[in-house]
Amino acid sequence: MRTNSFCSSGMHLPNGSYITFGGNGAVGPGGVLGSQPNPGNYSAAWDATFQDFDGTKAMRILNPCTVSEIASSQSQCAWFDDPTELSMKTGRWYSAAEALGDGSVIIIGGFANGGYINRNTPNIDPENEGGAAIPTYEYFPSKPVTPPVFQFLVQTSGLNAYALTFLMPSGNLFVQANTSTSMWHFSISISYNSSLSSSFVG
C-alpha cells in the first residue's frame, strides 16, 4: 500500500474485491508527523522514512485471486492504491462503510484527521466539532454531488466514530452511535431516531 490505512473502514464488493476508505495522514518513526506536512501542519502528506502518503482521502481495492493462482505463485492479488485515480471527496478517519442493495457502498462520518476524539465539553459546535468532525456521507462509486450532512451524526456528536451500520431488508439503514439509534431512509435522507435502551426492538 502506498497510503496510510490506519483507522480506515472497509467493505466487500460484489465481485469479491475488498475496498478500504480513508485512514491517517503520513507518519514517521514514533508516530510523529511525516516529513512533508500538509497545510496547517496538523497532518502530513508524505514521510520519507516510511515512504507512506496521506491516506485520509484514499480508496484502496484488494483484487481477488484464485486458489490455483496462489498455489502456483502466479497470484494477481494486489492492492490498488493510487489517490490520483481513486479517492473520496472528503478525508475521513474512523468512518463507517456499509454495502447497499445495488452493490455500491455508503461511507459515513468520521473525523478530519487522526488522533482526535470528539468529546468537546461544552459541545458548542455539534456539527463540525471545530473542524475536526466529518458529519457527511458519500458513496463508492462516487456520485456527482457534494457529500450531504447526516443529521444523526450531528445529534450523536461526542461519540460517533465507526457508527454501527446494518442494511435492512427494506433497503434502509439501521445506524447506531453514541446512545442513539436511527432507521435511515438514506435514499430520501429521512431518519427516525430513538434513544438506545435494552427494550429497543429493531
Language model feature labels by segment:
Residues 1-5, 84-92, 153-159, 199-202:
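Short loop/turn motifs that recur once per blade in beta-propeller domains
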Residues 16-21, 25-27, 103-109, 170-175:
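Entry beta-strands of beta-propeller and related beta-repeat scaffolds
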